[in-house]
Amino acid sequence: MPADTRPAAIVLMGPTASGKSQLAIDIAKRWGGEVISVDSVLVYRGLDIGTAKPNAAMRASVPHHLIDICEPWETYSAADFAHDARAAIDMIVRRGALPILTGGTGLYFRALLAGLSDMPPAHPEIRAMIAAEAKRDSWAALHTRLAEVDAITAARIHATDPQRIQRALEVYLVSGQSMSDWQNQPPKQRLPLRVLKLVLAPTHRKVLHFRIAQRFKAMLDNGLLAEVNALRTHPSIHAMARPLDLPAMRAVGYRQCWEHLDGMYTAEMLYQRSVAATRQLAKRQLTWLRGELDALWFDPEHDQSRIEKVMEAFLNR
């Protein structure tokens, strides 16, 4: 069999709070790599503490990409990510470095590695019309309307997920085809890389739950509420009629802090709700990761030497 001459890349996945960011840096230092964030919240400026965003020292130690590239009142799609990540990969490969893609946003990984169907781009006028209808009738009503034209997509979207409801209706109104029909088309532009997929996840769920709880407590101690309050009072967000519909503000921890600052519940309830929501996020991520049949799983506390051996074998073959 001829040698695979495609450039190598590392895909490091895992649930939230599993230690991916530090491992990505360790790999980058050891094998001359650069880190590409695959996280739908790390793209936003000003969301630092609640996202466990790599700090300045971590980002200075090795190059990082696709962090702090959007304002929190802007939208950033999986297609945007795939485009930007490809550009970053090309630049890294040209420098002779190893691309290390790390994060927990499954849709972004799929968009990059498998490609997206060529759906219509965003249409500002249609999007504004849908938002106005939602303000008048509610997102639940629009979810019902979506089910009438695209039952498959509606079944996958919760009635409280305005971003995805809006996009699905937008696709239908712009093209006359449902999102599920578009998604059934063959994907385009698969990534021309030789990829090693690694999953970092504690073997025992209680370990992950402990890490989640400890991390959120540290976030609160480090000023998460002040960070959320600064976002709430920013003129571009404060002027919005429904700021909690912003993708950035729906991030786990941020919505709960916002609602706590609104007086909806106590500090103890804030902690409990945020930890529970983060556990649910981790559960969804683990469910998706189990479908990545070609990925190798590692425990963050016990498999460091095994990770090194797998990396050496992959890069030297």
Curated annotation (Swiss-Prot):
Nucleotide-binding in keyword set: yes
Region (Interaction with substrate tRNA): 39-42, 163-167
Family the entry assigns: Belongs to the IPP transferase family.
Ligand binding (ATP): G14, P15, T16, A17, S18, G19, K20, S21
Catalytic reaction equation(s): adenosine(37) in tRNA + dimethylallyl diphosphate = N(6)-dimethylallyladenosine(37) in tRNA + diphosphate
Organism encoding this protein: Xylella fastidiosa (strain Temecula1 / ATCC 700964)
Pfam families listed in its UniProt record: IPPT
GO MF term list: ATP binding; tRNA dimethylallyltransferase activity
InterPro entries: Dimethylallyltransferase (IPR039657), IPT (IPR018022), P-loop_NTPase (IPR027417)
Keywords attached to this entry: ATP-binding, Magnesium, Nucleotide-binding, Transferase, tRNA processing
Enzyme Commission (EC) number: 2.5.1.75
Assembly description: Monomer.
Residues carrying the site annotation Interaction with substrate tRNA: T105, R127
Annotated binding of substrate, by residue: T16, A17, S18, G19, K20, S21
Gene3D superfamilies (UniProt xref): 1.10.20.140, P-loop containing nucleotide triphosphate hydrolases
GO terms of biological process kind: tRNA modification
Function: Catalyzes the transfer of a dimethylallyl group onto the adenine at position 37 in tRNAs that read codons beginning with uridine, leading to the formation of N6-(dimethylallyl)adenosine (i(6)A).
Protein name per Swiss-Prot or TrEMBL: tRNA dimethylallyltransferase
Domain of life: Bacteria
EC primary class: transferase
Entry annotated with the keyword Protein transport: no
